[in-house]
Amino acid sequence: MYENGKIYMGLAGGKRVELALNMCNRHGLIAGASGTGKTVTMKVMAESFSDAGVPVFLCDVKGDVAAICVPGQSSEGMEKRIDKFGLRDRFVYQGYPTTFWDVYQEGGHAVRATVSDMGPELLSRILGLTAVQEGILHIVFQIADDKGLLLIDLKDLRAMLTYVNEHRTEYMMTYGNITSQSVAAILRALLPLEQQGGELFFGEPALDIRDWMRTAADGRGMINVLDCVKLAQNPTLYASFLLWMLSELFEILPEEALKRYNPKVSDPVKVDFDNEA
């Protein structure tokens, strides 16, 4: 619960346990055995961030977070907790502004990225390529860039790999050695990603990650819920999404630490995210 600029987390030894918003950019871990309230704790934090006007992103692996968009219902256990934590005079059941996302486009808005946006480095990590294979993938991306070709989806990447392999003798003097064996290995490595639904993730229109940094009309932060019930069962595609998301955040979010050591850096807008994967 958000009160007086802090998130009221609970009680310990009769004293309130609170989380100050200016400390929320630290990494955190919610741990505990089954049934001890990990998901409830995460939901309380998400709701509190929203009340503070901070957009939230979280992954719903079990499918039990979606109800955050509708008001809860009273129960005997809930009434006891309201009294225990001294919230009787100010607690109200309410829904929160929520946007649902789904890589598989079944339980929410589509989440897409282009192959060009992903880049050869991230793709190589996702596909588990060797150093030689990664080098060839860099060559393929460079040739596409030199020719002004955008790699939108996995079909584009396959077509480009096939094209480079067929014309490798023309490019070897400019870009370096290209072997058909390595190209074939990259094509094989694409199969698991395609089978897990990669054709749904890679494509257009690509998601602008700034769409997750919105507030509702009443000033509360938007809670963005990614449906991961199916996605978590497909680790290659899940890793693709997470690596892409982190790289996008690293690219567009300002670095607060720069201001401390460089007074010429302009004052950036600060956005806090709560992410449980």
Tell what function each PLM region has.
Residues A46-V56, G63-A277:
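P-loop NTPase motor domains
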Residues K15, M23-G28, R220-N224:
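Pre-Walker A (Motif I) flank of P-loop NTPase domains
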Residues G5, K15, R26, Y96, ...:
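Residue-level signal for beta-strand positions within conserved beta-sheet cores that form or flank
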Residues M1-V17:
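N-terminal pre-Walker A segment at the start of P-loop NTPase domains
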Residues T41-M42:
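Post-Walker A alpha-helix
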Residues I30-S34:
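The conserved Walker
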Residues A12-L21, W212-R214:
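Pre-Walker A adenine-sensing motif
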Residues K38:
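Conserved lysine of the Walker
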